């Protein structure tokens, strides 16, 4: 999945096509868990997790990332955005290597 995404991002960047990425704070699916948010995916809730998820996403070669779909987390997402720091490749790899999905969600390519 990552290789395909990187190829698509590169193609879009080379051809002046804007890229919008979504589901920035999705950590996995709900499976049989009780939903406590209005999203169809299970979102990160802690500020540190939201910071890392948003900063990782905005450190990619994209143009925009819409806000989250869960109102109760909006303040944390906006806070993370206001403090955005471009992550180095090493910092990005550290985030992706330490993230563990709570529940797989094929629609999010989290399996």
What are these regions (language model features)?
Residues 1-111:
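Beta/alpha (TIM)-barrel catalytic core signal, keyed to glycine-rich beta->alpha loops juxtaposed to Asp/Glu
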């Amino acid at each position: 999945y990552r290789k395909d995404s990187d190829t698509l991002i590169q193609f879009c960047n080379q051809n002046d096509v804007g890229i919008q990425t979504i589901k920035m704070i999705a950590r996995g699916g709900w499976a049989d868990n009780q939903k406590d948010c209005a999203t169809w995916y299970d979102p990160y809730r802690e500020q540190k997790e939201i910071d890392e998820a948003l900063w990782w996403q905005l450190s990619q070669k994209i143009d925009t990332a819409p806000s989250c779909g869960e109102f109760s987390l909006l303040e944390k997402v906006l806070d993370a955005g206001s403090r955005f720091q471009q992550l180095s490749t090493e910092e990005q790899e550290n985030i992706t290597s330490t993230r563990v999905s709570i529940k797989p969600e094929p629609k999010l390519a989290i399996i």
